[in-house]
């Protein structure tokens, strides 16, 4: 009889701190076993991310998403909104982990032990998996929002401050999903 207890660790990461538009999206993942190919989502091609996201969803013991909407980002600031989204992801897990590891330097307020790990998305498989799930979901959302708010190019730049996006902002003005507290959006509104 195996009396060894498995410690359940959830990895958490965010996507979308820097863009001028859209929500910040987080994921929390508890892995059953290692999955080959996991690394920081930014180091993977879209095709690799999509394939790994399917495997993570199939093979993980549990996963969940959290988010903070544009209004929350503008009201709280991106730092606090990100921590809120991380907490929401952990609380949405169908299984409570024994501890949580988060990519970055700060941890959300949780009732379970939590540790921040700088560059954790490259070092800890659970955080890598969370990074991939969050990135795939947010990218899909921005492609869908591109159809609702045409002309900004959200499907291509995902809301980041590219020259194309800045030019569209100047031409069209901000839409509902633009972060009013972010420059150059705030600069446009104040003119």
Swiss-Prot record:
A divalent metal cation binds at residues 13-14, 103. Its EC number is 3.1.26.4. The keyword Magnesium does not apply. CDD domains: RNase_HII_bacteria_HII_like. Residues 7-191 form the RNase H type-2 domain. One of its GO terms (cellular component) is cytoplasm. InterPro entries: RNase_HII, RNase_HII/HIII, RNase_HII/HIII_dom, RNaseH-like_sf, RNaseH_sf. Manganese or magnesium. Binds 1 divalent metal ion per monomer in the absence of substrate. May bind a second metal ion after substrate binding. SUPFAM superfamilies: Ribonuclease H-like. Disulfide bonds: none annotated. It catalyses: Endonucleolytic cleavage to 5'-phosphomonoester. One of its GO terms (molecular function) is RNA-DNA hybrid ribonuclease activity. It is found in: Cytoplasm. Keywords: Cytoplasm, Endonuclease, Hydrolase, Manganese, Metal-binding, Nuclease. One of its GO terms (biological process) is mismatch repair. Its main location: cytoplasm. Pfam families: RNase_HII. Its cofactor is Mn(2+); Mg(2+). Endonuclease that specifically degrades the RNA of RNA-DNA hybrids. Belongs to the RNase HII family. PANTHER family: RIBONUCLEASE H2 SUBUNIT A, RIBONUCLEASE HII. This is Ribonuclease HII. It comes from Legionella pneumophila (strain Paris). The gene is rnhB.
